[in-house]
């Protein structure tokens, strides 16, 4: 493996064509798009999370009762159900889908596998280096030249600084072979660069890129907040089940958002003419008589 000398993450304006963005990701393992999400959208998203009382936190799940989460961090899930701004605006952001279309152009449809809203406070320790793709353990057996099946988007909703734990990224690490968990654990933070960003930027991460949240230093008194979206080829199962969403909420969504959350039939590229997530070999949406863009009561 080779660490680039004086590496820098490439940055692009939000008007940059998605194929150009994805080429940077293919070359370096990461790219940053600036000013991609309006600040007003972020502020209203924060209000949904903070004020509705519907946010669900991983730290509260019984399944994680034996896990030692840092007390300075919180991870909210169930964002589609919690936040109207997330499900109606962020999930329909054209740039996000242009990026995903470029990423999965040879694989067919894609969908949202997981969405997490993370907050860290002073004293939060640095994460261990990792690859997000290992949510699906089979992917660890892929070679660097194999088709990428996932893409992570990290969206700061407050500024990312070195002091408050900006994500550390190892450029070019998506091309490294034979990286065992032990090899990754042995990496030094000196091998990485900090992804300092403003609220509303988007960082695009290749599935094999090694990265970690940095340490939120005690003297950095601000709260760092971010939205982590994991999109995958529709050929991989979603982490968040579509069955958890009530139908009236689903029918308030756009057709695109319905597909993202698993309520429509998806089609991989190639010889599969039926699709996946079907209803009696027809489309799920037709079989269910699913409507879209409906006003949700209450």
From Swiss-Prot:
Q: Which residues bind Fe cation?
A: 130, 132, 211
Residue intervals passing through the bilayer: none
Under which pathway is this protein filed? Secondary metabolite biosynthesis; terpenoid biosynthesis
UniProt GO MF annotations: dioxygenase activity; metal ion binding
GO biological processes: terpenoid biosynthetic process
Q: Keywords in UniProt for this one? A: Dioxygenase, Iron, Metal-binding, Oxidoreductase
For this protein, what is the EC number?
A: 1.14.-.-
For activity, the cofactor(s) needed are: Fe cation
Listed InterPro entries: Phytyl_CoA_dOase-like (IPR008775)
Instruction: Please give the coiled-coil regions recorded for this protein.
Output: none
SUPFAM superfamilies, alphabetized? Clavaminate synthase-like
Q: How does it assemble?
A: Homodimer.
Q: What else is known?
A: In A.calidoustus, the austinoid gene cluster lies on a contiguous DNA region, while clusters from E.nidulans and P.brasilianum are split in their respective genomes. Genetic rearrangements provoked variability among the clusters and E.nidulans produces the least number of austionoid derivatives with the end products austinol and dehydroaustinol, while P.brasilianum can produce until acetoxydehydroaustin, and A.calidoustus produces the highest number of identified derivatives.
Q: What does this protein do?
A: Iron/alpha-ketoglutarate-dependent dioxygenase; part of the gene cluster that mediates the biosynthesis of calidodehydroaustin, a fungal meroterpenoid. The first step of the pathway is the synthesis of 3,5-dimethylorsellinic acid by the polyketide synthase ausA. 3,5-dimethylorsellinic acid is then prenylated by the polyprenyl transferase ausN. Further epoxidation by the FAD-dependent monooxygenase ausM and cyclization by the probable terpene cyclase ausL lead to the formation of protoaustinoid A.
Q: Give the similarity note.
A: Belongs to the PhyH family.
Q: Which PANTHER family match?
A: IRON_ALPHA-KETOGLUTARATE-DEPENDENT DIOXYGENASE ASQJ, PHYTANOYL-COA DIOXYGENASE DOMAIN CONTAINING 1
Name of this chain's protein: Iron/alpha-ketoglutarate-dependent dioxygenase ausO
**Organism annotation:** Aspergillus calidoustus
Q: What is the lineage of its organism?
A: Eukaryota, Fungi, Dikarya, Ascomycota, Pezizomycotina
């Amino acid at each position: 493996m080779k660490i680039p000398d004086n590496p820098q993450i490439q940055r692009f304006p939000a008007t940059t064509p998605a194929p150009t963005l994805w080429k940077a990701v293919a070359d370096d393992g990461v790219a940053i798009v600036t000013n991609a999400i309006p600040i007003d959208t972020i502020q209203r998203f924060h209000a949904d999370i903070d004020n509705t009382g519907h946010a669900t936190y991983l730290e509260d799940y019984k399944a994680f009762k034996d896990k030692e989460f840092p007390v300075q961090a919180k991870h909210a899930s169930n964002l589609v159900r919690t936040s109207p701004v997330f499900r109606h605006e962020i999930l329909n952001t054209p740039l996000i889908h242009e990026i995903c279309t470029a990423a999965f152009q040879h694989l067919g449809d894609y969908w949202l596998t997981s969405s997490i809203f993370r907050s860290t406070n002073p004293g939060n320790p640095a994460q261990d280096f990792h690859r997000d793709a290992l949510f699906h353990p089979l992917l660890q057996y892929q070679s660097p030249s194999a088709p990428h099946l996932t893409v992570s988007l990290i969206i700061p909703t407050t500024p990312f600084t070195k002091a408050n734990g900006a994500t550390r990224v190892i450029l070019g690490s998506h091309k490294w072979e034979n990286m065992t968990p032990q090899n990754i654990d042995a990496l030094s933070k000196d091998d990485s660069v900090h992804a300092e960003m403003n609220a509303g930027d988007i960082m695009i991460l290749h599935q094999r890129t090694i990265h970690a949240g940095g340490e939120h230093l005690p003297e950095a008194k601000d709260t760092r907040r971010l939205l982590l979206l994991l999109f995958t080829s529709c050929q991989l199962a979603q982490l968040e089940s579509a069955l958890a969403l009530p139908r009236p909420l689903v029918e308030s969504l756009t057709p695109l958002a319905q597909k993202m959350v698993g309520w429509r039939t998806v089609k991989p590229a190639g010889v599969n003419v039926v699709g996946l997530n079907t209803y009696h070999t027809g489309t799920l949406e037709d079989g269910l008589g699913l409507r879209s863009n409906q006003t949700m009561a209450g």
